[in-house]
């Protein structure tokens, strides 16, 4: 069996985000490529906030698994988790572990000449609806233009990151029912504000209202909002461990669960989270806002769960480009199609 020779993390920049790319090289000369969470969105601080995550990978996890059999993913995951639990069971440590785990799955698929999806049991469907996840645009004209571009690219749904519900109204007036709309406010409101906004979004017929309150992990507040509005709620990108997902789902407030694969421990942990979504009969919609290994891993994961309903596909405004050299996942008639690999299939 090939053994792990090197584990490294590096930072890539694009116009609005960064990617923390993780590479695991083995004794046969093959390289698996993964991705960790990258810190915060603030352009002035995003590189600095990614630095601790990179340090976890380069200084802690990499040395820990160097020399080990590369295909023993489950064993390596639990050993890293058990060792790192004494450091922190969430946050920065788990973000780093996620990136290493994705790289190991990519490496295993490349060794076997097959896709990660096949390693996980194969797809349960021929396609999953994809939506274009737009960045915050704030201006009606830009919002209309980017939605039109996304529709021309084959998307039948878009997600807005706009806190003003009247911007959603502008889009509905422009396109009518020709496009499905989701709205993510990234925990901008207190519960009373969220209820007022949620009622307006309900009138506009949105698919879901995402992360309505701050703190984003205030499960009681999420449940309060959900009980007071008609449109469905989505949340989960800021949960980390299985117990927290269980507590969130137990509120009964969610219609859509949105785990972030680069925060929860990678694909190894993701499989357990999707089982939980199935048990609670809640739709699985993996969160993602980067083009690269994390998006591809989310697609592989989504296709192996019968709970999957939507795939989030990041969308860059006209004239901007992602830093990672990968194409968007294949689509047809608004549906994301299964990926072929080998490995994750993106590099």
Predicted regions and their residues:
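Structured beta-strand/loop patches that form or line metal/cofactor-binding pockets in enzymes
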Residues: 1-33, 37-44, 320-324
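Flexible C-terminal active-site loop/helix
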Residues: 2, 12-14, 27, 100, ...
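Metal- or metallocofactor-binding catalytic centers and their adjacent structured scaffolds
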Residues: 25-111
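Conserved, mostly hydrophobic/aromatic
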Residues: 29, 61, 100, 113, ...
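N-terminal small/glycine-rich loop or linker at the start of catalytic domains
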Residues: 111-136, 167-180
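Active-site mouth loops of central-metabolism enzymes
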Residues: 127-142, 184-191, 234
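Catalytic domains of carbohydrate-active enzymes, especially glycoside hydrolases
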Residues: 149-158
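Catalytic core of soluble alpha/beta enzymes
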Residues: 160, 165-293
């Amino acid at each position: 069996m090939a053994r792990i020779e090197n584990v490294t993390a590096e930072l890539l920049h694009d116009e609005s985000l960064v990617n923390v790319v993780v590479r695991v090289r083995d004794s046969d000369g093959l390289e698996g490529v993964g991705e960790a969470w990258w810190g915060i969105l603030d352009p002035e601080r995003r590189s600095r906030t990614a630095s601790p995550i990179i340090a976890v990978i380069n200084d802690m996890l990499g040395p820990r698994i160097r020399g080990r059999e590369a295909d023993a993913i489950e064993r390596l995951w639990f050993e890293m988790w058990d060792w790192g639990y004494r450091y922190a069971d969430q946050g920065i440590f788990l973000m780093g572990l996620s990136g290493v785990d994705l790289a190991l799955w990519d490496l295993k698929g490349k060794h076997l000449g097959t896709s990660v999806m096949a390693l996980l049991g194969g797809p349960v469907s021929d396609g999953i609806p994809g939506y274009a996840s737009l960045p915050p645009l704030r201006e009606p004209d830009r919002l209309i233009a980017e939605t039109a571009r996304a529709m021309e690219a084959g998307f039948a749904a878009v997600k807005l990151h706009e806190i003003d519900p009247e911007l959603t109204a502008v889009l509905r007036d422009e396109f009518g029912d020709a496009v499905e709309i989701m709205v993510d406010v990234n925990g901008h409101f207190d519960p009373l504000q969220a209820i007022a906004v949620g009622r307006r979004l309900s009138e506009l017929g949105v698919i879901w209202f995402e992360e309505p309150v701050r703190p984003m992990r205030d499960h009681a507040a999420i449940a309060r909002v959900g009980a007071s509005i008609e449109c469905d709620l989505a949340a989960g990108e800021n949960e980390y461990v299985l117990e927290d997902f269980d507590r969130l789902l137990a509120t009964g407030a969610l219609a859509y669960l949105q785990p972030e694969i680069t925060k929860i421990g990678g694909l190894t942990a993701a499989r357990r989270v999707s089982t939980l979504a199935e048990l609670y009969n809640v739709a699985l919609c993996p969160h993602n806002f980067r083009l690269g290994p994390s998006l591809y891993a989310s697609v592989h994961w989504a296709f192996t769960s019968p709970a999957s309903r939507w795939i989030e596909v990041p969308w860059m405004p006209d004239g901007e480009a992602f830093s990672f050299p990968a194409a968007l996942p294949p689509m047809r008639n608004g549906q994301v199609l299964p990926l072929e690999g080998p490995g994750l299939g993106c590099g």
